[in-house]
Structures are given as C-alpha cells and as structure tokens.
A protein has these predicted regions:
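ALDH superfamily catalytic-core signature
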Residues: 4, 10-154, 217, 264-266, ...
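Conserved SAM-binding loop
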Residues: 6-7, 195
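Conserved C-terminal structural/oligomerization subdomain of aldehyde/semialdehyde dehydrogenase
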Residues: 39, 136, 143-271
Length: 271
C-alpha cells in the first residue's frame, strides 16, 4: 500500500497520478512546472537585476521549474535593461556539458528544441519581437541560444503562457505597480517569482499580492533545505524543504491522556 506519492514533473502526468491515487486515497505532493515572473521596478539596481535575470532564465539551459521566464519590467528602464541583457545573452558560451568553458549546454531532447522553435514562430506571428537568439544553432545536438522575446505588442503571444523548459525569456513592460502585479499573476502556474526594487514597502506590498509559493526579493534562485519549496495552481501542491515538507510526510494524531485517579462520574446520575 502506498500512503503518499511525491512527484516532480509536468501537469499532465500529475493528473494521471492523482487519478490513480484515488484508489486508496493516497496523499500527494506535486512539484510541477512554472512560468515565473521576474519583476523589475524602475528603482532597482539594474546591473544586479540583469545578472540575476541571466541566471534565472539561462542557467541549466532554462530547464528549471523555477526559471524566471517572464521579465516584467518598468517601461522607464526597459530599453536600458534589455540592451544590457541582450549583450549578456549574446556573450554566453554555448557548448558541450563536459567542456569546462560551457555556460549553456544543449536541451535534453529534440522535442524540446522543436517546441521552442514552434512557440517562438507563433509568438512572432502575433507581434513578438526577437531581441536576441530565436533559432537553434546549426550544429549537432539540441543547442538553442539564449533567446529574448519582447512581447510588449503581443500580449496574447503563446510564449507568455507555455512553459518552454528552455532558455527563452518573454518580456512585458508596465507603467504602475498594479499593472506589474496584474501581469505577474496572469498565469495558471504559481511556483516562483522575483522582485527587484530598493523600496522595502513596495516589496512587502508585492509579496502579499503575488500568487506564488516562492518570492525572491533582490535575488533569484536562493534555496535552503530549511525553506519550503513549492507552489500552487498548475505548479502543484505540497512542499519540499522546511517544516512543511516534514508535515507532508506525517499523519496528524490527536491524543487525550487522562492523568487523574479520580473515578469518572456516571454521566446519567442527577446532581
């Protein structure tokens, strides 16, 4: 008998697992995908935010559930930010995983590469602009360059909603804090998020309103076994790490222990 199932993967497989777990009502912990927003306000440290964004989306070739795949940036600094980001993306060393100089390796499968090509083409067709990358490299293997798509004029572009599991960043600009939150929460996923600002009060307001299991402020991808890791919506439920993970693997038991030696009175005797 299986009492609990912990799964890391995609929503479709998770649905299959949940349906089958109903046979014996086993509990589940599901760590699924994400389409994580990376919000940069106009007062942010741009150089730090650029470096964090490069790591957030291009590390591990973007094959990460917490990849910061949606850059939501103040229109006041958007052009300057994208200029720096595109330069960093173009300078990334792409190569074989066993080469110590490699910074971005290949995608795991040809299917991932083909999906990226398809989604980028569909996004460009509705108005997205390729800022950097955009097409697989002409070499053996599933190599795909760091890609940046400006979707400011393409709010319905599929690259904004589909998880690539690859090094593809979609960009949207905003004019107000409310706009930023609306764009950030416009997703069926709810795993991770990043917020870059020097305004601590703003950071706390945004933290409260973001629908995400993880919020990183002025950093990205910080992890610890002491911190709960997980999300909600299409990102699943349950947690890895922290006290919450331990609770997911335990059963609650209420115990009442009477210590008095006095006899229990007859409840039906009139007093």
């Amino acid at each position: 008998k299986v009492d609990h199932i912990a799964f890391t993967g995609g929503p479709e497989t998770a649905r299959h697992i949940v349906r089958n777990s109903a046979e014996n009502l086993a509990s589940t912990s599901l760590e699924l995908g994400g389409k994580s927003p990376f919000i940069v306000f106009e007062d942010a440290d741009i150089d730090s935010a650029v470096n964090a964004q490069v790591s957030g989306i291009f590390a591990a070739t973007g094959q990460s559930c917490v990849a910061g795949s949606r850059l939501i940036i103040s229109n006041k600094i958007k052009d300057a930010f994208l200029s720096k980001l595109a330069a960093k993306a173009a300078a990334v060393v792409i190569g074989a995983p066993d080469d110590i100089a490699t910074e971005v390796g290949p995608l795991c499968t040809p299917a991932q590469r083909d999906t990226a090509v398809k989604l980028i083409a569909q996004s460009v067709a509705v108005g997205a602009v390729v800022v950097s990358g955009g097409a697989p490299l002409k070499r053996d293997g599933n190599f795909f360059p760091p890609t940046i798509l400006d979707c400011s004029d393409a709010p319905d572009a599929p690259c904004l909603t589909h998880e690539f599991f690859g090094p593809v960043l979609s960009v949207l600009g905003f004019d107000s804090e409310e706009d930023a939150l609306s764009l950030a929460n416009d997703t069926a996923f709810g795993l991770a998020s990043g917020v870059f600002t020097r305004d601590l009060s703003r950071a706390h307001r945004v933290i409260r309103k973001l629908r995400a299991g993880i919020v990183w402020v002025n950093t990205y991808r910080a992890v610890s076994p002491m911190a709960p890791f997980g999300g909600h919506g299409l990102s699943g439920h349950g947690r890895e790490g922290g006290l919450q993970a331990a609770l997911d693997y335990t059963k609650v038991k209420a115990v009442w222990l009477r210590t008095s030696d006095d006899p229990i009175p007859d409840p039906f005797v009139m007093r």
